[in-house]
């Protein structure tokens, strides 16, 4: 298992998943990646690939909209908001915009961001009030980001990876990766409201003892 999961590896896996339209290939690629991770990073990665910043049962949100993303990208790269808008219109995706301008703004890239740091940023954004403060937090991490790290960090904050991977396919990948029944994975995820914990339990073959959690809607 990988001791420290990098956002770059997550992003490269996401790119491979996006490059195929075949569901079996998508789940195989994701399953191979998930098997390499430690339990904490497995939980993070499963949530993120399902498009969740937090567990489904967790009511927290980052409240990071387009204005914060635009301002942070501008501050991190030196491009003005006026430069960014026509690029966004052309590309149609804030993550693709991030990748393009980071690549142009930096002469060299050294991917260093981890999934732990990604989770920390998401938590801090949720806890922080005010557009300026949120922008500063995001800018600081974007300044360290490679084009691919920036692309998927922004996609995650925007709420959609857009790689053709819905939650049911993530459940399927978990089931295949850890040799569990898909029905058991899906049922546990429904009861737990956390696909990350579901993935960890699937690895441990501990899906049958899951109980519904009170006050967490199914």
Q: Language-model segments: which ranges?
A:
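N-terminal nucleic-acid-engaging modules of covalent nucleotidyltransferase systems
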Residues: 1-218
């Amino acid at each position: 298992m990988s001791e420290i999961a990098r956002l770059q590896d997550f992003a490269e896996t996401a790119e491979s998943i996006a490059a195929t339209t075949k569901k079996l290939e998508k789940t195989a690629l994701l399953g191979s990646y998930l098997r390499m991770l430690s339990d904490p990073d497995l939980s993070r990665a499963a949530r993120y690939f399902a498009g969740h910043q937090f567990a489904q049962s967790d009511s927290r949100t980052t409240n990071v909209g387009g204005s914060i993303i635009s301002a942070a990208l501008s501050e991190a790269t030196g491009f003005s908001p006026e430069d960014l808008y026509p690029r966004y219109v052309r590309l149609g995706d804030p993550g693709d915009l991030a990748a393009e301008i980071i690549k142009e703004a930096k002469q060299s890239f050294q991917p260093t961001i981890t999934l732990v740091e990604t989770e920390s940023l998401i938590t801090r954004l949720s806890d922080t009030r005010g557009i300026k403060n949120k922008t500063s937090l995001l800018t600081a991490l974007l300044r360290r980001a490679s084009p691919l790290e920036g692309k998927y960090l922004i996609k995650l904050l925007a709420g959609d990876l857009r790689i053709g991977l819905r939650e049911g396919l993530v459940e399927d990948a978990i089931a295949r990766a850890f040799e569990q029944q898909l029905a058991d994975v899906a049922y546990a995820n429904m009861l737990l409201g956390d696909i990350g914990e579901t993935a960890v339990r699937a690895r441990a073959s501990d899906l049958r003892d899951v109980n519904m959690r009170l006050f967490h809607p199914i």
